[in-house]
Curated annotation (Swiss-Prot):
It is a multi-pass membrane protein. Belongs to the UPF0397 family. It comes from Clostridium perfringens (strain SM101 / Type A). NCBIfam families: PRK13661.1 (NF010182). This is UPF0397 protein CPR_1556. GO terms for cellular component: plasma membrane. The keyword Protease does not apply. It is found in: Cell membrane. Keywords: Cell membrane, Membrane, Transmembrane, Transmembrane helix. The chain crosses the membrane at residues 11-31, 44-64, 71-91, 111-131, 149-169. InterPro entries: ECF_substrate-spec-like, UPF0397.
Amino acid sequence: MKKNKLSIKTIVAIGIGSAVFMILGRFGSLPTGIPNTNIETAYAFLSLMALLYGPLAGFLIGFIGHALKDIVFFGSPWISWVFASGIVGLIIGFGARFIKINQGVFKLKQIFMFNLIQIIANGVAWFLVAPTLDILIYSEPLNKVYLQGVIGGISNMITVGVLGTVLISNYSKTRIKKGSLRKEY
């Protein structure tokens, strides 16, 4: 019998994570002054979920959460940015191999590694994927979409760098450090 790739726990996390991402995306964002581009707290939450549940869950939480936000609050999804949100979760989820927050350790080395990974993830998603898909799918003007991508990417890097680091650090403090318990005789 094949081992199921997605556990019940992960599926529930994807559902709840997508709903929280949607709510944070709508009510936890600040406008940047660039049309349709906001400072989003949802990506700090996505980072935590991606590190906890891995790349597939990270992708699905970002993709489904962003799609739901667009559908519920704007009427239809902007698929290029929905896909980019999934890419952020996917790449950060691959970082779970290097950043084991469930082991109760999130010190300088892990903070540096997390921020390096999230900068790469946001750079790929917002500087490359979202604007390129905007041009290919929606025939949007080149200068507009790359400006939106750069502003969105930089704001997400800063938000995840600050809020994500604090959120993940606080979460890791709730975990028991590996090897910290001893058997009493």
